[in-house]
């Protein structure tokens, strides 16, 4: 008998004796036959997942995380009702004074992050450093290699990363004090510290990446905000901003038009020259409003444009030779090329018509835009001989108006189909030619 057979026999005998002992302990007589033929290696008691000697404890129902009411009371407005930086700092300091052991500090920090925009401190670096100072020191730092491999105190580390992410969202650059607090709370090998190193690397590289920067503090006056938006869109520095109409204050009474909106426009000398060369038989279009975001504020603008002229009417301007002295704009280089060379670049370009002017108004109706067109006629006399078509996004359809009648506002027309619009434009063109 080999040692393999001896090993198998001993294993079968041990399983058989185990089944006999379980039968004796359970009180089942030996004479009771089994319902199924069982070997010595099988147990007489079948295993069931739902049968347990000790009942399982009931699983507690997961409830949403609720911030304690005492934390909410800290951020409620005081008697004067002002929500400013001083009241926010007072709420954070009072949490540390009344809660020495800093229990519930994670919920408090999450609540403070949500309340920061209400107090206007979402861009203040000192406030973020004060929130990081709420964490207990030298408690969440990993002490050995096992704690460094696994996330040590994951909920606290996620809260620290949330503070840094809100700083990144509002463009707040951390400083050396932030780094010292993160090392003191979480240590060098932690996720908040890794987030800090990434912010320190990329913030310095992307700080001045925008070639057209927008000031941090935007003007509150709608007129100044419109001037800033138009200057931000117009690449020509020689363009002139003109205020065609000032908005009236809300206290003004006894005026014919108490709701007079502001009208601000911009036009460059090149745009004036292009409008002077425009064919009077072809209409120009007032389109809009189009949105423009200046940080967290959205303004709307309108444009005065025309369709692309036909190829036979296009004039190619020759670049003077004195412009090519140091920075050539045209190069005619005849290199030896084979028949397989591709002379065309693979670029997707959409050619659009010229834009003659832009404006921002306090109201986006046709009556306000007609005043803008009338103001443009003072510096562009040829505009009085060109038909103007209003294509407003919020109007019922394309409204056709001829700016020769300065005293009358163009009547509103019902919605038209594309065929009726073409017929109306052609009729207006024939009228302009006559």
Swiss-Prot record:
> What the protein does?
Adapter protein that plays a role in different signaling pathways including TLRs and IL-1 pathways or innate antiviral induction signaling. Plays a role in the activation of NF-kappa-B by forming a signal complex with TRAF6 and TAK1/MAP3K7 to activate TAK1/MAP3K7 leading to activation of IKKs. Once ubiquitinated, interacts with the dissociated RELA and NFKB1 proteins and translocates to the nucleus where it induces NF-kappa-B-dependent gene expression.
Q: Which SMART domains match?
A: ECSIT_Cterm
Instruction: Please spell out the taxonomic lineage of the organism that makes this protein.
Output: Eukaryota, Metazoa, Chordata, Craniata, Vertebrata
**Modifications made to the protein after synthesis:** Ubiquitinated on Lys-371; leading to translocation in the nucleus together with RELA and NFKB1 and expression of NF-kappa-B-dependent genes.
What GO cellular component is one of the record's annotations? Answer: transcription regulator complex
Quaternary data: Interacts with MAP3K1, SMAD4 and TRAF6. Interacts with SMAD1 only after BMP4-treatment. Part of the mitochondrial complex I assembly/MCIA complex that comprises at least the core subunits TMEM126B, NDUFAF1, ECSIT and ACAD9 and complement subunits such as COA1 and TMEM186. Interacts with NDUFAF1. Interacts with ACAD9. Interacts with TRIM59. Interacts with TMEM70 and TMEM242. Interacts (when ubiquitinated) with NF-kappa-B subunits RELA and NFKB1. Interacts with RIGI, IFIT1 and MAVS; these interactions promote RLR-mediated type I IFN induction.
Broad class of where this protein is predominantly found: cytoplasm
Protein's cellular compartments: Cytoplasm; Nucleus; Mitochondrion
- Official protein name in the record: Evolutionarily conserved signaling intermediate in Toll pathway, mitochondrial
Mitochondrion is among the record's keywords: yes
